[in-house]
Amino acid sequence: MKCNRKMMWLVVLGALVAQAGAQILTGDQVKKLAPSTYYFSGQSAAVQVRNTAGLKNSAGKIVLAGLVDTSGYSTAIAEKYQGFLITETKLTFDGATLEPGQYGFGFKDGKFTVMNVASADLFSVASQNDDAMKHPVPLKFEKDGGRYRLYAGRKYVVVKAD
C-alpha cells in the first residue's frame, strides 16, 4: 500500500515537473531568438519583433510566431500571409499536424492558414473569435490548459506543441 502511494506521488510529481518546463517566452527571450527578417515566397520581409511571440514545450523545444511587413509582396500573397511560424516540435491545430520547420501563416475569413515558404497552402482550420478579450494585441500566445492559443487580435487558434 505504501509503495503504491509513493509510486503514485512520483508519477504526479513527474507530470508536474514536465508541465513546469513548458512556458510562454518573455519579450526579452523572444528578442534573442526572433529573426530580423524572414524569407517567404521569394522575398525577405522585416519581422515585427514587437509583434512576435514564443513558447517552449516541456522538452525545451521552441515555437516562434511573428508578424512581418508584407508591403513588398503581391496583393495575392499579402492578403493571406501575415506572419511566420518557426517550430522545433510537431504542432497540432484542430487535427491538422505541422512538422518541425519554417512556415508562413495568416488569419482570413474565419480561417487560419499555414503555408510552406513557397506560399503553397498546407492546411486551413477554422479560427475562433474572443469577443470577451478586453485589450487585444497584434499577436500573442496564451496558455489554455495543456495547449496554447495563438491570438492575432481577437482571432485565435488552439495549438498543441508536442
Residue map of PLM features:
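Detector for intrinsically disordered, low-structure N-terminal pre-sequences
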Residues: 10-11, 16
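Sec/Tat signal peptide C-region and signal peptidase I cleavage site
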Residues: 16-22
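Short, charged/polar low-complexity linear motifs in solvent-exposed/disordered segments
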Residues: 111-112, 116-119, 131-132, 140-141
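Mid-length scaffold segments of soluble, non-membrane domains
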Residues: 72-118
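Primarily secretory-pathway and cell-envelope proteins
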Residues: 22-76, 124-162
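Bacterial N-terminal signal peptides that target proteins for export
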Residues: 1-10
